[in-house]
Amino acid sequence: MTITEIKNLLQGEVSKEQLEELKADERKGVQKLLISYEKRQAKYAKALAQFQSRFSYEKEFWQKDQLVAGVDEVGRGPLAGPVVTAAVILPHDFDLIDVNDSKKLSPKKRQALFPKILEKAVSVSVGLANNDVIDQINIYEADRLAMAHAVQGLKVKPDALLVDAMNVPLNIPQVKLIHGDAKSNSIAAASIVAKVFRDNLMDAYGELYPEYDFKHNAGYGTREHMEALEKYGPTPIHRRSFAPVSEYEK
């Protein structure tokens, strides 16, 4: 085989016999390709092991034939826009090994995973609390309310919840996990769904209120955002209970 043919071969599945043949090939180009292949395989094996370890909490419920939903939120800190939550029930054979804490993933990777999670999950639901609700009952309670809405929106009722550092106000057994999106694939999937949903929503708000640069700041208090607040005052989606938004009321 030519070097190009071997390179193409090593991009897919390779049998043990083929690998042995290639290892016996003394061409430097072939040996260099083999080194790269083995590095990729080692990296994949490590990622797969980490992915499988993030199902340890789910397996405790699966072993009892119970459905478990991961629940997470995004958007507690911004000065504008809603807090968005998601609840996700994953099947036992879920195999998207790139699913991880959404904060560890690039926007491009999150957007790519979003439709795949929707396709492979048993059920996905999103809940949100807008800025008016946040101003009325505070961000913590609004977050809990949105989580409850997300869980209630699932097409099948879970037997238990895995929740990232919160308690959901529902009569369902729950496991609260600090940094849960890095410990549970179900919570990680929920974090990706919530993040992409909110980012897309803030992009739409960016079209509606272009002066505030919501497409790039997602409602957080960047310099451009603060300058727009000072110049134009708050929009209908700003959280008046958050300092310093109220200071800029016109």
Swiss-Prot record:
Which Gene Ontology CC terms are recorded?
cytoplasm; ribonuclease H2 complex
What catalytic activity is recorded? Endonucleolytic cleavage to 5'-phosphomonoester
User: Which UniProt keywords are present, listed alphabetically?
Assistant: Cytoplasm, Endonuclease, Hydrolase, Manganese, Metal-binding, Nuclease
Q: Where does a divalent metal cation bind?
A: 72-73, 164
Sequence ranges assigned to domain RNase H type-2 in this UniProt record: 66-250
* Cofactor (UniProt): Mn(2+); Mg(2+)
Pfam families named among the record's database cross-references: RNase_HII
UniProt enzyme class: hydrolase
Entry's Gene Ontology BP terms = DNA replication, removal of RNA primer; mismatch repair
Domain of life of the native organism: Bacteria
Residues spanning the membrane: none
Q: How is the cofactor bound?
A: Manganese or magnesium. Binds 1 divalent metal ion per monomer in the absence of substrate. May bind a second metal ion after substrate binding.
Give an example GO molecular function: RNA-DNA hybrid ribonuclease activity
Enumerate the InterPro entries for this protein.
RNase_HII (IPR022898), RNase_HII/HIII (IPR001352), RNase_HII/HIII_dom (IPR024567), RNaseH-like_sf (IPR012337), RNaseH_sf (IPR036397)
**Family as reported in the entry's similarity comment:** Belongs to the RNase HII family.
Q: What does this protein do?
A: Endonuclease that specifically degrades the RNA of RNA-DNA hybrids.
Q: What is this protein called?
A: Ribonuclease HII
Show the taxonomic lineage: Bacteria, Bacillati, Bacillota, Bacilli, Lactobacillales
Q: Tell me the gene name.
A: rnhB
